[in-house]
Amino acid sequence: MLTRIGGLLRQAESTDNPHEAEAFMEAAQRLATATSIDLAVARSHNASREKQVAPAQRVIRIGEAGKKGLRTFVKLFLVIAFANDVKCDISQSSTQVFAYGFDSDIDTCEALYSSLLIQMVRASDTYIKSGAYRNETAVRTVTETIGRKKYKRQEVVVVAGVTARLNFQTAFAERIGKRLESVKQEAETKAIEEESRGAGTAVVLRNKAIELKDFYTSTSKARGSWRSQSANAGYSRGARAAGDRAGRAARLGGEPELGRGSTQLGR
């Protein structure tokens, strides 16, 4: 399955036509979803509980502690995981993600993430170097303390490069998530309508979701919540729009084989 997906991703990478690239990417996600359904049906037919494949936990390394922008990297992995039936916990430092799911689904997530991470960073670098964000202003709320009282006021500021980058990458990840989820839903709907697999596909998918939820609940030790952006992160409308466009045009692949490639960017 990964080899076939790899072929689709290489086709997406090699074409200069954005519509073809999008079609190949969606085909890759469609194949991943169809394979995931087939494996779920196969598991439901396995009468031997001892040999039945079960969900597992895997640690995904995102980056080194202190590295800027890790939250948007995590955000990208999360949207990919959501579209591929994988639940996640995030370390407080955002340096790693704990992925919960079936091995084949986690493999798909790692493959997609490795390709899209590079594209997201390259696209945001190009945007920042263009200087387009420097023409944009934003309204920032500032809290001042005078005596014993605190006052809030708003001021207009020029969008900083770090703010533009974070907004760009956040919008990129959100658009990718929407694209992958749309393809997944279409593939699942088609499989349920066809019902040619000999088993109630809808029931199988529901049982898979329940099994994963039970595994996650019994295994996860996560406490608290995680935010994709810090509380003081600014907002850039222009960077968001640019990131969304890049997410629409994103291609996958570029690797000779799909597998567990590196999920960290070298610097």
Question: What do these predicted regions represent?
Answer:
Residues 1, 37-267:
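Extended, helix-rich structural scaffolds rather than catalytic motifs
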Residues 10, 31-34, 43:
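Terminal, compositionally biased segments used for targeting/anchoring and flexible tails
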Residues 1-22, 26, 40:
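Short, charged, low-complexity amphipathic alpha-helix
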